[in-house]
Amino acid sequence: MALQIGFLLFPQVQQLDLTGPYDVLASLPDVQVHLVWKDLVPVTSSTGLQLKPTTTFEDCPVLDVICVPGGAGVGPLMEDEQTLDFIRSQAAQARYVTSVCTGSLVLGAAGLLQGKRATTHWAYHDLLPTLGAIPVKDRVVRDGNLFTGGGITAGIDFALTLAQELVGVDTAQLVQLQLEYAPAPPFDSGSPDTAPSAVVDEARKRAAPSLKLRTEITERAAAKLNLR
């Protein structure tokens, strides 16, 4: 039977959180990849791309891999019990529970990060301990069957790491080559540790409203989990 891989799809998802890992994992042999949401109505990503679910919470098969991407829409998801219940149910049966970027905050709101090493987008890293996680500032972090990827583009690194676990290093390397994944960006500003201070300051300024809102939501989620 084909390996069942499911990505949570939701309004205001960060499309690269989803489509980067999707391309990697959908390129593996003998897999079936699902885009899962409450219904089959297309959703709009945070940058305006229309994405169509392929199955619903009700009809989704038992998944071998569940992946929660991040994006502007994670705040509402963290307080959406229908979504959290679906994630918990699938996570209890899945071989691997995974996330990209701020999708790890949703896993945390579902109670799946307690005592676990995890990562997320750098701007929201300090929220992880509130959800019981042990924060690690790596692009990909594994703790048992939990894989979390850092911000946005780290999703490709995450997916290749998971691909190696699923099908072996040779096939994972083949997929990497087929996708010509050999990053060589023109600037060394992809991390707050290497970006110019003025760029970091501007990025933090732009993230501040979202950080404030997500901090409040994270505190409420922690209270529901009796972590506060």
From Swiss-Prot:
One of its GO terms (biological process) is regulation of DNA-templated transcription. Pfam families: DJ-1_PfpI. The gene is inhA. Optimum pH is 6.0-6.5. This is Isonitrile hydratase. Does not require metal ion for activity. Optimum temperature is 35 degrees Celsius. Activity is rapidly lost above 40 degrees Celsius. Sensitive to thiol reagents and oxidizing reagents, but is not influenced by chelators or reducing reagents. Catalyzes the hydration of cyclohexyl isocyanide to N-cyclohexylformamide. Acts on various isonitriles, but not on nitriles or amides. Probably involved in detoxification. CDD domains: GATase1_PfpI_2. Its EC number is 4.2.1.103. GO terms for molecular function: cyclohexyl-isocyanide hydratase activity. It comes from Pseudomonas putida (Arthrobacter siderocapsulatus). PANTHER family: ARAC-FAMILY TRANSCRIPTIONAL REGULATOR (PTHR43130), DJ-1_PFPI DOMAIN-CONTAINING PROTEIN (PTHR43130:SF2). It catalyses: N-cyclohexylformamide = cyclohexyl isocyanide + H2O. InterPro entries: Class_I_gatase-like, DJ-1/PfpI, INH-QAR. Homodimer. Keywords: Lyase. Changing T102A: Strong decrease in activity. The active site is at C101.
